[in-house]
């Protein structure tokens, strides 16, 4: 099988978030280190694991203003929200999604990585209403 232009063997279209990431156009938002799970394979460092800290591209941030600044510095076309579990801090997650969409417009692609543990229909509706474009679930393997 032949590799594609993304150095992968997948010959279908990659999700938009993946396309931006490969091109270096996606800001990574580490929303919190808090997570309801204790997966044996969790890659978080001791500085982040189960700690309520926020980073944008490994830059510590404490405000929405700093989030926007980091996105502008890298000319981001989108953002991926990860953690811990971003749904452990749902209000913050919703605030950051709406802030980015309001500042950059609806074309700014936002996806989130989360677990099924905190995912409910009302939570999904709030994420959709805030402007989330894509969601990726980590399976329960522990």
Question: Language-model features: where?
Answer:
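Canonical Radical SAM [4Fe-4S] cluster-binding loop centered on the CxxxCxxC motif
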Residues: 2-8, 13-61
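A short, flexible N-terminal coil/short beta segment enriched in small residues
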Residues: 19-32, 73, 78-80, 84-87
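Conserved short hydrophobic patches within well-ordered secondary structure
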Residues: 30, 80, 93-96, 127
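Surface-exposed amphipathic alpha-helices with a cationic face
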Residues: 43, 94-105, 128
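Core AdoMet radical
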Residues: 47-61, 74-89, 103-119, 123, ...
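Generic structural signal for well-ordered alpha-helices
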Residues: 67-68, 93-98, 124
């Amino acid at each position: 099988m032949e590799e594609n232009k993304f150095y992968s063997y997948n010959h279908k279209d990659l999700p938009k978030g993946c396309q931006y990431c490969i091109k270096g156009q996606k800001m990574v938002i580490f929303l919190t280190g808090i997570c309801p799970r204790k997966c044996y394979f969790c890659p978080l460092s001791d500085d982040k694991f189960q700690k309520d800290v926020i980073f944008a591209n490994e830059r510590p941030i404490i405000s929405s203003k700093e989030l926007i600044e980091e996105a502008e510095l890298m000319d981001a076309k989108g953002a991926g929200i990860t953690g811990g579990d971003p749904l452990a801090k749902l209000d913050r997650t919703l605030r950051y999604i709406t802030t980015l969409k309001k500042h950059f417009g609806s074309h700014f692609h936002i996806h989130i990585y989360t677990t099924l543990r905190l995912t409910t229909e009302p939570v999904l509706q709030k994420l959709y209403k805030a402007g989330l474009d894509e969601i990726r679930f980590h399976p329960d393997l522990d």
